Amino acid sequence: MSRSSAGFADFFPTAPSVLQQKRFKVTRERPRPKAQIDSEHSDESSACPTETRAILNLSNGGASLDSGQISSTDLKKTSPESSVEGSASSTAGDRSALSLSVAQHGANSHEARLDTLTPLTNAESSPPQKANSPRNKIAEGIVANTTIDTKSGINPLHTPPTPQSQGRRTGSIRGYKLVYDPDTEKRSSSKEKRRKPRYVDIILSEQNNCPPDPRLGIPNYMRGAGCKQKRKYRPAPYTLKPWPYDASSTIGPGPPAQIVITGFDPLTPIAPISALFSSFGDIGEINNRTDPITGRFLGICSVKYKDSASFRGGGPVLAASAARRAYYECRKEQRIGTRRIRVDLDRDGVVSERFVARTIESQRMGQKSNLQSTEEVKSDSETKKNEPPPTAPKGPSGKTSVRPIVAIPEGPRANFLKPVMPSLVEEVPILGQIKRDPYIFIAHCYVPVLSTTVPHLKKRLKLFNWKDIRCDKTGYYIIFENSRRGEEETERCYKMCHMKPLFTYIMNMESQPYGNPSYERSPSPERCRAEQRERAERERLKREVGLDIEEEKRQRAVDLDPCQEVLTIIIRDLKDKLLEDVKSRIAAPALYDYLDPDRHALKRKTLGIADPEGIKRPMFRIDDSFGTPDSRSGLSDARRPFSGSTPNILALPRIRKARHLGRTDTAFLDERRKQPLRRREVRPLYHRLQQLHDVDDSDDEQRTPKDTDEQDSRPPSRMSSGTSESDDGDGFVSEALGLPVVELAGSGQNKEPDEILKDNQSVGESSQLESNEISPELRKRKRASEELEARKRQKEDDELFGINPIAEAEVEGTQIIATPIAVDINLEVSEAALSILPKESNDNRQETGEANHLDFDGIDVTSSTIEKDRRGILDPLDDIDNAAAREESRTEVGWRVSNDEPRPIVDDDDAIIMDLDGWQNLIKDDEDLHFLRDILVGYSESNVGNLSAWAWRQKEIKALNHPGDVGPLRGGTGIAGYYVPNTTGAARTEGRKRILESEKSKYLPHRIKVQKAREEREARAKNDPHTAAVEAARVAAAKNISKSTSRSTRVNNRRLIADINAQKQALPTQSGDGDVLRFNQLKKRKKPVRFARSAIHNWGLYAEENISANDMIIEYVGEKVRQQVADMRERQYLKSGIGSSYLFRIDENTVIDATKRGGIARFINHSCTPNCTAKIIKVDGSKRIVIYALRDIERDEELTYDYKFEREWDSDDRIPCLCGSTGCKGFLN
């Protein structure tokens, strides 16, 4: 039993030869026609014995089957069913049919036998029997008629080879071909259309057994000729006829009118050149170019033509036509002299300038090369002169000595000796000369300092890119390039050579990759000059501002009206005094009167609250500060003209305990009778409830003055026991009732109205009390005589000191005229007027009434005036319990019939906007309101909540939209040009169109409102000189404010960097340590800023502290991209609707994009007069964009800088500038 060996195709199925064989088999294995199937039925009988023999051989385990014993054709002829299936199947189907028949035969003969088709196939992978197979039926019949002795066991069967595909027989019908179709005939009659189509059989022959590919019949099909397009291939665009230049309609520069000639001899005169090129047109200018340094000709000539009306008796010739003709005729074969020239068109002179620059550069290079060659020739000649003659004897080496022995010269020849090689050890310390260059230092204690050591050290460190090696007495300095590469090279040299030997020494190195750590950068001369200029400018501006302020002060002093200033000061003081007087004289007594327990007796009785003890008499009273001092205070003040005569308005009213409350028979006491000393008055704490003075008042102003006057210093009219009844009762009546007040004749005192009233009351009261004890007439005469004597003494004193009696009273809105009167004053007070007084005992009420009748008999006070005052002062206090406000009286308008012509009562204005104010203005009376209600009957009510709150909210919204406008309006809420109507009626039907930047600028109501407010403020400042002076003073004060300098900060940053570098050297060197310990100086120097809404555009950046000029503010950070990527992103931003792109160019190839990744520096707006500038600096070898201050910037000032967009002259949509500064250019581009 043998096994077939695997072939080349099994191991290399993808080999080209194997693939070609497979393609060949596929072309051969094509389905056969039905005609061949009918011819094969006759061969069935002959095919059966063959198949029987094949199966017997397989069952006997004989030799393996090959293609010669059992062919695929014989197997296919066993039965009609198998033949039909085989004609439509592939080679694999034939092979499977054969194997199934054999396997079925083996399984029927020997049940315990396993047949294998392949060496790796058994019964588990493929079942031995298969139902309903025609091959099984044939195999069973054959096996039943034969008796074959086979041995039991597993006999592996050889896999039959792949049979070749069955080819079709020659002469068989392959198909049908339509040769006549009446439907497709164009010129056919109705009879011909009735004919039937004719078909012709396609017979298979030897030539067309494998029909050729019809596509190969197309010429050059493999080269693409089969899919030719109808379009014509055009390797170059059409050559169109150029349009003639028209200066009136063409935009841009015209055709060139100038040519440049090169290639001629530089020594050629200008005459032949001019003669040659003047034949083409009139020459306007000819220029033979020369070297600007040496003045020699370069062989380059520029010829510029001009338009001529008639050239050499002919027609007009344009300058462009003459230049074009000269270019086309002289560019190839034209010669000047013996050289061929070259002519080029030169529109703007750029070509000639390029030729001149190139020629000058080549001449410079040629001169340098010639100079070097001459120097080499001279050196060679000098060496040859010093060589010995050829016949001189040679040395032992057989070569001439390169360095001949020269005798030491004597005398004058000693001057021609070469100087001695200078020592490499420098006397000046090198460390002070190194600024920022990285270096490595080797101290002299490790390697001795010698000049001969420097070349050896250079050779030792030749693997590193050092810039220079220098030495002084302290040691050696290996200096590297001042860049990031130099720093890395310094670190690499330190790592590889530190503590390594140099001859017999050890190189103990000290690395400084960031230069001299103790170096402090001094300002450059340019910066010093710039600072000096700025300082001089600031001083000049300061002097000018000072001069302007002084001039303004002098002008104001000239224009100042003293009367007006005095009037202003008086009005201001009157207002302050009136406020304090109202607090002390009206508010405080009214509050105390309201808090009187007698007023609330009915309420306590209703609520069942017991009466407090001691309510019969008030335990405290308010003693007026203007009534307690003696009446001669005016005299004492007049005698001291430089002392303050104004009484302390801000002092609190003095509250003291009333004495002798039980006495009702108080009489006028004798002036010789001394009163007992007063006890220390106790001041209750509830006086703090009265805010009668400011918080900033001093303690002396708030302290109540004590009554320490002696009795002798008082006038007789004031020497009384001073009971609380007279002070509280009568004084309050005079104040509350608002009675007219006059001053007695010859008083010579500055008194308030209540003081005069109290003096008169005290006089009458004392006389009345004294008359109860002594005879009334005697008491009156005695009292009158004493009073007259006192007044005479006071008048004499006033005349002695030259003081005129003046009485003033300052009350807001009321002018009180003090007139000296020498008549008796009578007052008739009705019972209704007295009923408003506080409730007191009968005795006190009687005394008060008598005093009033005695002192005021001549003045009639009607009950209406008293009632009005009572309503204005006391009624609000009574209405607190009832919580109801009285409605003020409204002015009524009386309407009458017009006399001349009929006129409407009210002219309705249709332009008024019908908002809340508009409706209130429209409705004039109750009739209008009634009609409005009738109109709104059919409408449902709106739920607006609280009506008052809703009305207040509507008016607040109106105030926000129309600041400063009150009442009805005649213009709608909107911005001019904000709402643009659509031509089609709706925005959705407009389509896509570009919105101009000028129109976008109108969509900034916030900016427009701020701009309007700014313009109004500036206009008011211009009209008001006081505001201008205040603003100038504020600017001057802001300049004097000390601003923090960043010099100390930079010094601290340098020290911190040095410490970090020292720590980096001490740490183990690993990848990434440098990035972890990298120090960003820009973050440490950043100023505190914030972003907020800007009046210029959208968001803005504001300073949070004062920033000095030339200080760094912030770094502009973002994503670093190339220029091509930035252009692509800008287009994407425009398409996606991002209105603002934050692209900042660093150089020609790099752009910072902060649109989606960046800091708050991108919010800085543009201004034509900015306060900042952007600079590009290098930090650690990389370029950064940093914003610096151009001038001193105050806190909360917006930061701006100039965007510096390129000017777009031919742009239809320029970006408008919204900065609003005085130097605004109007557009960004």
From Swiss-Prot:
Compositionally biased spans, kind Low complexity: 80-93
Catalysed conversion reaction: L-lysyl(4)-[histone H3] + 3 S-adenosyl-L-methionine = N(6),N(6),N(6)-trimethyl-L-lysyl(4)-[histone H3] + 3 S-adenosyl-L-homocysteine + 3 H(+); N(6)-methyl-L-lysyl(4)-[histone H3] + S-adenosyl-L-methionine = N(6),N(6)-dimethyl-L-lysyl(4)-[histone H3] + S-adenosyl-L-homocysteine + H(+); N(6),N(6)-dimethyl-L-lysyl(4)-[histone H3] + S-adenosyl-L-methionine = N(6),N(6),N(6)-trimethyl-L-lysyl(4)-[histone H3] + S-adenosyl-L-homocysteine + H(+)
Coiled-coil ranges per UniProt: none
Pfam families in alphabetical order: N-SET (PF11764), SET (PF00856), SET_assoc (PF11767)
Main location: nucleus
Lineage of the organism: Eukaryota, Fungi, Dikarya, Ascomycota, Pezizomycotina
Subunit structure and binding partners: Component of the Set1C/COMPASS complex.
Native organism: Aspergillus oryzae (strain ATCC 42149 / RIB 40)
Name of the molecule in the record: Histone-lysine N-methyltransferase, H3 lysine-4 specific
Described function: Catalytic component of the COMPASS (Set1C) complex that specifically mono-, di- and trimethylates histone H3 to form H3K4me1/2/3. Binds RNAs which might negatively affect its histone methyltransferase activity. COMPASS recognizes ubiquitinated H2B on one face of the nucleosome which stimulates the methylation of H3 on the opposing face.
EC number: 2.1.1.354
Gene this protein is translated from: set1
Region (Disordered) residue spans: 22-198, 362-403, 514-541, 620-656, 679-733, 746-796
